[in-house]
Amino acid sequence: MPSLPLLLLLWAASSYSFPVFHNGDRQNVETVWKYLENYYNLGKNMQAKNVNGKEMMAEKLRQMQQLFGLKVTGNSDPETLRAMKKPRCGVPDVAPYAITHNNPRWTKTHLTYSILNYTPYLPKAVVEDAIARAFRVWSDVTPLTFQRVFEEEGDIVLSFHRGDHGDNNPFDGPNYKLAHTFQPGPGLGGDVHYDLDETWTNSSENFNLFYVTAHELGHSLGLTHSSDIGALMFPSYTWYTEDFVLNQDDINRIQDLYGPSPNPIQPTGATTPHPCNGDLTFDAITTFRGEVFFFKGRFYIRVNRFMPEPELNLIGILWPNLPVKLDAAYEASMIDQVRYFKGSKVWAVQEQSVLRGFPRDIHSFFGFPSNVTHIDAAVCEEETGKTYFFVDHMYWRYDENTQSMDPGYPRLTAEDFPGIDDKVDDVFQKGENFYFFHQSVQHRFNLQIRRVDDSRDSSTWFNC
């Protein structure tokens, strides 16, 4: 009979190998199995109830969790299931698009393309412009050039299809598998197929045709999916923003295949923030129902006491109608709102919805003078309902109860907040303290004794 330590070891190994389905929802088995079949090359002839099938499923789950930046457990936990249900590209995350050093590529640098048909949701001219801009995303950072042809079939053919369309990769109707592409080569090689049933747009609503096309063209040129959540080539659809900039991860990978742009000034891309980067600064910080949200570019970093690690995600995932590169934010907990600032505009948000009538102008909404063009930082003191707006080295105070500015402001920040001598970049309240941020340093200002009692690196919020 095996010893107790051996039995425990066997139990641990089996619990690690076999996926667990939470809440007794056996429907999840089919969801996970089908997802791993489609995107992770899980054998179609395997059965989930078979021991080998369970082991293989757990291994494929770990691959998926690794790529998506999830906790790697081999189990179908709720976070993994949520990721699986998001709209995404139909190209597999593994073979034939395996991440290897032998990715297929075009052997020529001048490629042609043709548009076979159109979506009914957009005018033809808008479709053509979106596709042309998507090609420019890649020609701007490589030696590649692209030309549309009309009388012949291009190297890359773009077309819209519904359901089973004869390429062994059927579409599934609205809101899930958006498009798929074939790797470089003759025939279907490089071709882009869109799901005709999707609502294609040229805005942040539904699915942006330019953004999806730019992603699919990455595959047309030989790129695989990226594990960088900020990359264009991340597998799931990430909401489009008007100031789109190609991520540096995408630039590095496409230049590995085709070389750099011939332009004398090499383009640089956006980068995804890493919470434990000691030099990391933030655009805005706010609390919300006990959590803290740190905003940077298109991203937020979310911290609460129930999460062992900070959550990095895209602003558009939670708030698709908010701008990116915010200036400031604060929570008005007495009315269950968070207010976000960019330039001279303010957005009032409850839950995930921007309230009707917003954005509003800060001059008419709060009463700022016309020479205030933006807000650097803001915080609402919980006990008093007074909101402090910091601009350069001055601050204004606003009464949330009377909805008016207090008289006698602006005042110098350093006079009323001793120790806060630099411009305030961000601020929020936690307990009896205001946390002031300047560049990558935070100062804890004790509201009871009215002075700074601690200063440290900003990344300490992320358990670094």
Curated annotation (Swiss-Prot):
Binding site for Zn(2+) 1: H165, D167, H180, H193
Inhibition and activation profile: Can be activated without removal of the activation peptide.
Keyword Nucleotide-binding: no
Motif residue range(s): Cysteine switch: 87-94
Principal localisation: secreted
Catalytic activity: Cleavage of the triple helix of collagen at about three-quarters of the length of the molecule from the N-terminus, at 775-Gly-|-Ile-776 in the alpha1(I) chain. Cleaves synthetic substrates and alpha-macroglobulins at bonds where P1' is a hydrophobic residue
Binding site for Ca(2+) 3: D172, G173, D195, E198
Residue numbers binding Zn(2+) 2: C89, H215, H219, H225
Glycosylation site positions: N202, N371
Organism: Mus musculus (Mouse)
GO cellular component assignments: extracellular matrix; extracellular region
Protein localization: Secreted, Extracellular space, Extracellular matrix
UniProt-recorded name of the protein: Interstitial collagenase A
Protein family per UniProt: Belongs to the peptidase M10A family.
